[in-house]
Amino acid sequence: WRYGPRTPGDTSVVGWQLMALKSGHMAYLQVPPATIVGANKFLDSVMSDYAYYGYTDPGRGQATTAIGLLCRMYLGWKKDHPGVEKGIQYLSQTGPSAGNMYYNYYATQCMRHYEGEMWDKWNVKMRDSLVNSQGKNGHEKGSWHMKGDHGSERGGRLYCTSMATMILEVYYRH
């Protein structure tokens, strides 16, 4: 999947599509087996060192690695899978970002699904970071506006607030 028909896929769009398919599956909708095979084939094409993911080619991006790991978890990789263990270790060592809400969104979901001590530590850091960075005055009160990454800069306060809200509701999804 990508932004137009018949174009090579990218990890970002594949992530959104697989989250939608996961939600559909949880609502008892049938997901064609060929779709799962194709998603795994794409993820194989952008994976490097068995745990890291790039955007359209093998790589090691923070956000794309979090997306790739979450997709693999949704597609059946278990917590004890070597690729999941290695990827989760990488996310845990990297920790939450002060400005990259896209990475935080996917990494938080990965850590939540992984559970355990690494999730507990991640959750405290992420939650406290969001609470402490929330706007406190005037028209910004209750919102977020991080600086530093493409999405936060382009999307502004609305994007950051939306992503922060979805991060904080991770306890109630999937």
Where are these regions (language model features)?
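An alpha-helical repeat/solenoid feature that recognizes helix-turn-helix modules
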Residues: 1-37, 44-89, 93-128, 132-174
